[in-house]
């Protein structure tokens, strides 16, 4: 796939198989905003005339004007930089890549895109982090208008109020020393200990039961330590976070692809029908949203989805290899992924295949191995599918009728209140026990507001979030138990499967897909 196709809006949308006729026509030949188009035309005649000026704001070096414009993803004068955009200003991240406290892998997510939302949602003290930007080189005359703009969490009054209270009441200043990224060490030992014990049992006697027990371990890894590690929230040490994140690869996923489709797409644009890959990645088999086209069989999806969920892990396998070859996962292009990160995917897949298939087949024969592997795959897939899906697919988070959530999602992605969006499009269930076993994913609202905080702090944070929402009359969705929200999820899937398709009011915003 060539570079143009990788970044085309058609590829971005049809990868989820959800393009409508109107949208497909608007995306077939994506057009930049007016300023971007003028810049691109001017670049044709000046590309070889001058190089862009890099300004070090720390010393306030004078900027020499150069002809602006060009394609920042293809023109050589821009591609030689590890550029990102923050609040309308383009920076070169190159001198900071190996000095970022959170590690290079997280910073790589910002390369080649407007990273405002990533930046502001990941730092509990944004004023401190923003001061670091002032030390980075600014790319003068960079075609910022050509880069799809990002939401701006710091413009959310709700988010700012919650974050300030979390700093004062939960961490009381200790976040300066990284307290918000610690506290889950005990959970990590429990998860890894269980997984290791079940693998020993699996290799001792590979069969569907031991495979299923190991599958629970694989699911527990996926819900907890890999999730928290890839968010940079398991430790203040990026090496520890990376190692925890790589357990995703051992369990059958890909930490690299997860970081891009989960953090760049889902977390920033939760329940956006165009930009959140979780909304459309299962289509056309499953219709998670009434803004997607309706097929006759969707009315039965609440029944047949249980026959599809066991194969989730196999879908991951196919998708990860495809993404490696195309440089794009569902919802995001891998602009900043390093060669080493790509190599971890290959090494991780080979290790997973050896541990799940190769060694048991050698010890017990192919028949025993196949039975055990089936137990693993089906159990892990069902647990992950059920626990992931309930968080954003209930009437409160995707209402079929008008209300505050629908109104929020009908706004432009860059103008809607980001903090309010995270609250309205997520639902919680359970409490401390659920938090331990799901890595905080049961407290999905708090996780979406603070993805870089260790999940062990979410129960305390949830009290603050609920209180701030109550003061403002913002709905805060919480179910008492997993069976309760799971039952409501099943009913919602029946309702949305039968609901007529609703028109989308933001067709013009599909242009954003051309560069995501």
Curated annotation (Swiss-Prot):
Q: Which GO terms describe its cellular component?
A: chloroplast; chloroplast membrane
Span of the transit peptide along the chain: 1-47
Q: Where is this region: Disordered?
A: 1-25
Q: Lineage of the native species?
A: Eukaryota, Viridiplantae, Chlorophyta, core chlorophytes, Chlorophyceae
Q: GO:BP terms for this protein?
A: long-chain fatty acid biosynthetic process; unsaturated fatty acid biosynthetic process
Q: What EC identifiers does the entry list?
A: 1.14.19.31
Which residues does the record give as heme binding sites?
100, 123
The coenzyme or cofactor needed here is: Fe(2+)
The protein here is known as: Acyl-lipid (7-3)-desaturase, chloroplastic
Tell me the ranges covered by the Cytochrome b5 heme-binding domain, including all copies: 83-148
Motif annotated as Histidine box-3, chain positions: 444-448
Q: Name one GO molecular function term.
A: metal ion binding
Q: Specify the superkingdom.
A: Eukaryota
Per the record, membrane topology reads:
Multi-pass membrane protein
Give the family this protein belongs to, as stated in its UniProt record: Belongs to the fatty acid desaturase type 1 family.
EC class: oxidoreductase
